Amino acid sequence: ESLSPSRGVAKRKKKQRRNRTTFNSSQLQALERVFERTHYPDAFVREELARRVNLSEARVQVWFQNRRAKFRRNERAMLANRSASLLKSYSQEAAIEQPMAPRPTALSPEYLSWSSSSPYSTVPSYSSSGTATAAQGVNMANSIASLRLKAKEFSLHQNQVPTVN
């Protein structure tokens, strides 16, 4: 079978994927040292670094792009873990702080005596048939826990910000 001329040209024009660059330990040490100082080195710093570690400036530039992406990914994961652990501890505190007395049911006299001006008027009512799901309670606990988490983060942030007198 013979190939048509157009298919032969297309095969020759197809770009070869470049091989993955493998960095040796001294190159990685030098790259990481510069990354500790700045996540965005300028062209002169990249060129000098490339010359010192025997890489092209383009490879150094791509390494920094990838390293910044890794840094952001690790930072997000760390924040997510910290938030999850704080949320877990707050939800455990919320469970401890729950009142021992049962909440009033829809038909209890306490519930019927609440007026629309009551501060509890925005709390969702529980149905008399007992169909109020555990999910509502969980959502309320999560909501309270997330509000406590936000308040704690806010107060921590306020304590870290220097005041100007």
Swiss-Prot record:
InterPro entries: HD (IPR001356), Homeobox_CS (IPR017970), Homeodomain-like_sf (IPR009057), OAR_dom (IPR003654), PRRX1/2 (IPR043378). Cranial mesenchyme, limb buds, axial mesoderm, and branchial arches and their derivatives. Also found in the heart especially in the ventricular septum and ductus arteriosus. GO terms for cellular component: nucleus. Residues 16-75 bind DNA. It comes from the Eukaryota. PROSITE patterns: HOMEOBOX_1, HOMEOBOX_2, OAR. Keywords: Developmental protein, DNA-binding, Homeobox, Nucleus. Pfam families: Homeodomain, OAR. The keyword Nucleus applies. Residues 9-20 have a biased composition (Basic residues). It is found in: Nucleus. One of its GO terms (biological process) is regulation of transcription by RNA polymerase II. Transmembrane segments: none annotated. GO terms for molecular function: DNA-binding transcription factor activity, RNA polymerase II-specific; RNA polymerase II cis-regulatory region sequence-specific DNA binding. Belongs to the paired homeobox family. This is Paired mesoderm homeobox protein 2. It comes from Gallus gallus. The gene is PRRX2.
